[in-house]
């Protein structure tokens, strides 16, 4: 077990430390997606879990539930996009959350 093994072991330890830092950053990250000029907002945590959904009463029309569904999907897509933009990069894994 020469220096090559030691070097790989150090590299593995460094990657592990970097991943730990990224995980900590993701735990503290929250993003808000918006649709319909704020009629619907969705908050996602750094690991992609939906934390909160807010729907303003004026956008609820029982005759047009499809419109509300579209707003919810749009707010979720916006939140997911923001999450990808704000997530810390993972060294060696470009586009990890893409």
From Swiss-Prot:
Looking up Gene3D superfamilies in the UniProt record yields:
Nucleoid-associated protein YbaB-like domain
- Gene Ontology cellular component terms for the protein in this record: bacterial nucleoid; cytosol
GO terms (molecular function) for this protein are: DNA binding
Note the superkingdom of the native organism: Bacteria
**Which Pfam families did the record assign?**
YbaB_DNA_bd
- Location, primary (coarse class): cytoplasm
Compartments in which it is found = Cytoplasm, Nucleoid
- Family the entry assigns: Belongs to the YbaB/EbfC family.
- Tell me, in a sentence or two, what this protein's role is: Binds to DNA and alters its conformation. May be involved in regulation of gene expression, nucleoid organization and DNA protection.
Q: Which PANTHER family match?
A: NUCLEOID-ASSOCIATED PROTEIN YBAB
Query: Its quaternary structure?
Result: Homodimer.
Q: What is this protein called?
A: Nucleoid-associated protein pc0477
